[in-house]
Amino acid sequence: MKESGTFFLVVGPSGAGKDSLIDGARATLGNDEYVFARRIITRPSGSPGEDHESVAEAEFAERERNGEFLVTWHAHGLRYGLPQWLVGLLETGKHVVANGSRGVIAMLARQLPRFVVVNVTAPQDVLAQRIAARGRESGDDVMRRVARQAPPMPDGVHCVTVTNDSTLDLGVARFTDALRNGANAGSVPQPASRRHLAAKLDGQPLDEGAYEAILRDAIAGRYTAQELTAFLTAATRSLDDREVVALARARTRFTARIEWDEPIVVDKHSMGGIPGSRITLIVVPIVAAYGLAMPKTSSRAITSAAGTADAMETVARVDLTHDDVRRCVAQARACIAWNGRLNHSVIDDVMNAITRPLGLDSRRWAVASILSKKATAGATHVIVDIPYGPQTKLSARADADALAGLFEEVGKGLGLHVRALVTDGSRPIGRGVGPALEVRDVRQVLENHPDAPMDLREKALRFAGEIIAFDPRVASAAQGMRIATALLDEGSARAAFDRIVATQGIRPDPVAPGAHTHVIVAPAEGRVAAINGWQISGIARAAGAPRSAGAGIDLLCTIGERVAAGEPLYRIHAESAADLATAVAMTGPAGEASTAVRVDPD
């Protein structure tokens, strides 16, 4: 007898892009094995949206009375249904993919022997941007829609999460991976790795093989969200150094390693949390000018006003393929590319969907994730920036030192040479906060402009010097920094940056800072006592960053500087009057960022 197929119910919030992913998967998987259900809706045919069978209310009710539906539901003033004959397809071994509602999950789970929920998600700012682009709802309506809380997943349901926060091609690739990996989920009620998961829940350490088994079952959708939540919660409480190494090594088994014909391949990672601090766009050209290979892949912003990829995208193409990266390294010795298209991790899709909403302290888990991806990307040497300060991920110096030691120890376990530097994260680095404004600072440093932010220049030179010292011909980091300084001062780094931009694909219309501006001034005479990086980033995001690359904050003062009443503290840039008004509202006496820059009397 042929084994039953799996029923995939696709759910997710408005703006997640479910229809687009289903259409893309249909083009990829639409064959004898996968069937994509056509919904029956009491909506006129030809209406915008998915292809559906349109019926009148009376006909829908008649079909429902005749038992022609597998399941029905109400939404947006309409009635939706999936036909009963889909069950017959499952019985022949076909897999069925249907766009559905969270409200019918429990009912379908009881009816179908092999049932998987595919939960399509995206960060709230991405959802808001997509909904607003439809032009059917106002700004307040958009935010209310995004803020809606989804009901919890019923117990015992197999759920696979797909993060659709990037290009359509990548989203479709993730979605089709979820369908392929989840096809057998319902047939494995007891994953082979369950005993390892139970051991971790009891606080026992696991080895490399155990972690590999758990991850493989998690990717295949054989664990419920509740089981994975319990596992990750236990892992954040008890994950010793040897386990982090074991976890990192296990993760490398899920991605083929990229091989480079280079003795030294450099990479860099920052734990983030500091506004500005766009040193990568300076460090990479210096290292390239020296001659080391540095295929740098970087992320987009999640909660900050800009990621490295967001900033680089204001001047060059960043959605590079593996072939593009090899070409850039061959021609320019480096690249600064977006990592979403290059080292996407199905493991992270599954785990981040749990750790982020719960706010789990996953730093040790993150070390394994970060370094495993560096290893599979072909890096031999990695430098890590670990800022600490009141608004960063690490508030205490001791915690930062411990994490630095862990990075270096795990690096050894993966055969990597890792140098982790603990840095001051108590204040922003540079003046610009937001993609275009940060790139303006970068250009000033590369051009040795007299107005270039010295803190940005000095931090970039320190990291570039440490990287150059990876070369065995360089005796020390101090010598490396002298070499880096010379490369910057003589213009070699600027020339290398231009080569990288040209090789990646120069943007014909570089993004400029937003034309809508508002200056925040000192309320009284005194000294600048503190700059709250979290609030500064919040204002920049309210102004539109990084969605609007020209939006952000231009800091016009520094900590310790004496200011007069009415003297400018910072300038808000936005690309629209509405975004500017939203950001300015945050700075008022009752606003969330009223103390972004604190001025104390002398």
From Swiss-Prot:
One cellular component (GO) term of this entry: cytosol
Pathway where this protein functions: Metabolic intermediate biosynthesis; 5-phospho-alpha-D-ribose 1-diphosphate biosynthesis; 5-phospho-alpha-D-ribose 1-diphosphate from D-ribose 5-phosphate (route II): step 3/3
Enzyme class: transferase
PANTHER family: THYMIDINE PHOSPHORYLASE
Region of interest: Ribose 1,5-bisphosphokinase: 1-187
EC number: 2.7.4.23, 2.4.2.4
InterPro entries for this protein: Glycosyl_Trfase_fam3, Glycosyl_Trfase_fam3_N_dom_sf, Nuc_phospho_transferase, P-loop_NTPase, PhnN, PYNP-like_C_sf, PYNP_C, Pyrmidine_PPase_CS
UniProt catalytic activity: alpha-D-ribose 1,5-bisphosphate + ATP = 5-phospho-alpha-D-ribose 1-diphosphate + ADP; thymidine + phosphate = 2-deoxy-alpha-D-ribose 1-phosphate + thymine
Keyword Cytoplasm belongs to the record: no
Annotated GO biological process: 5-phosphoribose 1-diphosphate biosynthetic process; organic phosphonate metabolic process; organic phosphonate transport; pyrimidine nucleobase metabolic process; pyrimidine nucleoside metabolic process
Native source species: Cupriavidus pinatubonensis (strain JMP 134 / LMG 1197)
Identification of the protein by name: Bifunctional ribose 1,5-bisphosphokinase-thymidine phosphorylase
Superkingdom assignment: Bacteria
UniProt region (Thymidinephosphorylase), positions on chain: 188-602
Keyword list, A-Z: Alkylphosphonate uptake, ATP-binding, Glycosyltransferase, Multifunctional enzyme, Nucleotide-binding, Transferase
Tagged with keyword Glycosyltransferase: yes
SMART domains xrefs: PYNP_C
NCBIfam families (alphabetical): phosphon_PhnN (TIGR02322), PRK04350.1 (NF003338)
Record function comment: Catalyzes the phosphorylation of ribose 1,5-bisphosphate to 5-phospho-D-ribosyl alpha-1-diphosphate (PRPP).
GO terms for MF: 1,4-alpha-oligoglucan phosphorylase activity; ATP binding; ribose 1,5-bisphosphate phosphokinase activity; thymidine phosphorylase activity
Family named by the database record: In the N-terminal section; belongs to the ribose 1,5-bisphosphokinase family.
